[in-house]
């Protein structure tokens, strides 16, 4: 868990840096997971496949229609500006990120997913898997 938090911290503060690029490069070597595998992960039936450190977070979201563009945009995103804008839209009732997926840029959804996972979940990876699965199903 400490390793995951360190990784998330690096992403938030060093986007575009060597660390963020390392995360993206690491994800290239991890196979995509099927819908059934994501469901199994969410239900906690399989964890042994996810000991790959930096690639772990990426692989949950890089699935079927959730393409590499999703990850690339997220790695290039100005996290704090986007998060502020997203919060403003949610607070004013103009947006619900998972319900308004067709009108939302994938990068905004990634920011929302990351914040939700870190803030409201004891298991951020499972939370990200659930959100990733919802996005895949809505596409």
Regions found by a protein language model. Give the residues of each.
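Sec-dependent signal peptide recognition
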Residues: 2-10, 14
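Sec/Tat signal peptide C-region and signal peptidase I cleavage site
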Residues: 14-20
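Flexible loop/hinge segments at secondary-structure junctions
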Residues: 20-139
């Amino acid at each position: 868990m400490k390793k995951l938090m360190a990784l998330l911290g690096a992403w938030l503060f060093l986007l575009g840096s060597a660390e963020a690029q390392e995360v993206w490069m690491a994800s290239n070597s991890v196979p995509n997971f099927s819908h059934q595998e994501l469901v199994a992960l969410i239900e906690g039936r399989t964890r042994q496949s996810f000991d790959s450190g930096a690639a772990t977070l990426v692989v949950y979201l890089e699935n079927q229609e959730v393409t590499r563009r999703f990850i690339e945009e997220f790695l290039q995103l100005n996290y704090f500006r986007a998060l502020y804008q997203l919060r403003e839209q949610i607070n004013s009732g103009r947006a619900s990120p998972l319900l308004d997926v067709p009108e939302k840029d994938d990068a905004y959804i990634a920011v929302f997913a990351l914040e939700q996972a870190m803030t409201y979940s004891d298991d951020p990876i499972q939370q990200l898997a659930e959100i990733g699965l919802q996005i895949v199903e809505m596409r």
